[in-house]
Amino acid sequence: MTITSILQKMVKLKIITSSNFYLSTMLFNKNTLATFLSICVNHFTNHGHVCLPHVLIQHQKIFFTNHIALITKLWEIAKINTCGWIEQLLNSNTISNGSKNTPFIFYKNNFYINKFWLAEQKILKFISQKQNFKLINKNKIQKILKNIFNTNIDDTQKLAIILSIINNITFIIGGPGTGKTTIILKILLVLIRLHKKKINIKLTALTGKAANRLSESIHENIKKLNLTEHEKNIFNQKTTTLHNLLDLKPNKSFNYSCCKNKLYNLNLLIIDEASMIDITIMDKLISSIPKTTKIIFLGDYNQLPSISGGNILKNICSYYQEGFSTTTNKFLKQLFPNRITIKTIKKHQFSNINDKIIMLKKSYRFKKKSDIFKISEMLTKNKINNIKTLYQNINNDVNFKQISSKTNYNNIIFEITNSYSKYWSALKQSLPFLKIINIFNNYKILCILKNGLFGITELNLAIEKEMKKIGWIKKVTIINGQTWYFGKPILILKNNEEMNLFNGECGLTLLDANKKLKVFFLPKNQEQIYSIPIHLVPEHQTNWTMTVHKSQGSEFSEVVLILPTIMTSILTKELIYTAVTRSKKKLTIYSDENIFIKSLKKNIIRYSGLSIHQKIKF
């Protein structure tokens, strides 16, 4: 038996991908050990890891499959159990410690693909840079902050504002309702007033929906501020996605020089929903942004990470300890003596990183009695047993409903469909579009799978069937194989710049002035409501239900979460937390209790050398 024949079997059994097989065997066909390493490292990076800890190879914990004999044979042929296999690799042209250019890197007991190791080193250097406080005009900052701090903001929020002003890089971390957007308004105002000339600012997020929400929130709140016309003009700029800013497009190579030229005079970059940044985007961002640009990352690392490689925000926050280094603390106290309580941390090895992080803990959205708040707190603090008791009780704003049978499924469809009655009532009354879409967005059904009985495809079809039975859906039109009807909600699945539509945008199918069906979309950046004929709508899905992943960056008054009746690999604590924190007022969870509790005990693990401490799970 050869390594090639074993790997071919693994492809047939879907243990590894065919692309991994062909790439590894093509590059290293004469080197069994190098082929083995390539298969293992690529397998891990395909699952979101940045690196592969060598101890997992030692313990055969790479491929989680029942075909144990096959995996054992693979290890025997590659001679992994023999002494000196790593040294043998290091003596080849396949791998190095980073001192020379090789396909793989072995660094601090982790195996990397070369580009990921380089990216990780670049990120670490970027977040570790020292701040030069000598260049800061303390008197001018104090004068501006006096007016800003007269408003009702707590000490932690004040520290977040000051850190963002004195640091070139700041990470503002907080759950829902902790005032991240409020802080951004204050930071923008201070920085605008610090710059006599026009300041070049870019407001971005990781999804189109989150970018729109950031824009809406800022424009709603600037009305409360006493701004000059010059300040209003700066605030009234458009938000965009980080992908759009960096000109990152599928099937298009990244142009560093073009991106650098585009951003050469950028003074301030704000990135919302930063938990969704992957290692590749972070690498390209650092390479493109001028060293003088101030960057503020906003996010909640307890949420789902990016679909692609790494868990960057969580890794960076692993360096966090409450408080600041002596140098930073001294400067903060010079700015505001006796006004803010600041803890000093002595001898923190990574104080340069820690001094860039601030954690917002107080939620202004939820009352402490709120069960939604309690669940989110229990999830972040890993108090799973407390959630069990909450599951068994009847609560005001959280309701757990057991899934048990097919009959039960029909009852679920009836219940979740009837919750759309307010939306259909608004349509019947011909209310203005903005009111209709606000009513629609008050209620959202979330699930985790695309297919299966509890996936979005089946649930959307079942809801449509129930709506036809009720009499809400009447006349149905088929165009290009797509079903259309008055009131149909859709979700855009891919960016389409020509139509100014972006992944995650929601549209409603309504009648125009000529009684023709069109899909209407919310205005962006203070623009007008716009509509598109149904035959021109780009790739989309029906939006009575959506996945939790697609809901990131959105908020709803009432959320229904429907979990499948079998355990799946993507059911994790982070997914549940993300779903729970989409809701502002009411949450209903349909789930088998055992499945729900199992999900809470399962964390997303992504191996990376960027984290201060890497826990290995066997």
UniProtKB/Swiss-Prot annotation:
Keywords: ATP-binding, DNA damage, DNA repair, DNA-binding, Exonuclease, Helicase, Hydrolase, Isomerase, Nuclease, Nucleotide-binding. This is RecBCD enzyme subunit RecD. InterPro entries: Coronavir_polyprotein_1ab, P-loop_NTPase, RecD, RecD_N, RecD_N_sf, UvrD-like_helicase_C. GO terms for cellular component: exodeoxyribonuclease V complex. Its EC number is 5.6.2.3. NCBIfam families: recD. One of its GO terms (biological process) is double-strand break repair via homologous recombination. In the RecBCD complex, RecB has a slow 3'-5' helicase, an exonuclease activity and loads RecA onto ssDNA, RecD has a fast 5'-3' helicase activity, while RecC stimulates the ATPase and processivity of the RecB helicase and contributes to recognition of the Chi site. The gene is recD. HAMAP family: RecD. Heterotrimer of RecB, RecC and RecD. All subunits contribute to DNA-binding. It comes from Buchnera aphidicola subsp. Baizongia pistaciae (strain Bp). Pfam families: AAA_19, RecD_N, UvrD_C_2. ATP binds at residues 174-181. Transmembrane segments: none annotated. It is an enzyme of class 5 (isomerase). It catalyses: Couples ATP hydrolysis with the unwinding of duplex DNA at the replication fork by translocating in the 5'-3' direction. This creates two antiparallel DNA single strands (ssDNA). The leading ssDNA polymer is the template for DNA polymerase III holoenzyme which synthesizes a continuous strand; ATP + H2O = ADP + phosphate + H(+). One of its GO terms (molecular function) is exodeoxyribonuclease V activity. Belongs to the RecD family. A helicase/nuclease that prepares dsDNA breaks (DSB) for recombinational DNA repair. Binds to DSBs and unwinds DNA via a highly rapid and processive ATP-dependent bidirectional helicase activity. Unwinds dsDNA until it encounters a Chi (crossover hotspot instigator) sequence from the 3' direction. Cuts ssDNA a few nucleotides 3' to the Chi site. The properties and activities of the enzyme are changed at Chi. The Chi-altered holoenzyme produces a long 3'-ssDNA overhang and facilitates RecA-binding to the ssDNA for homologous DNA recombination and repair.
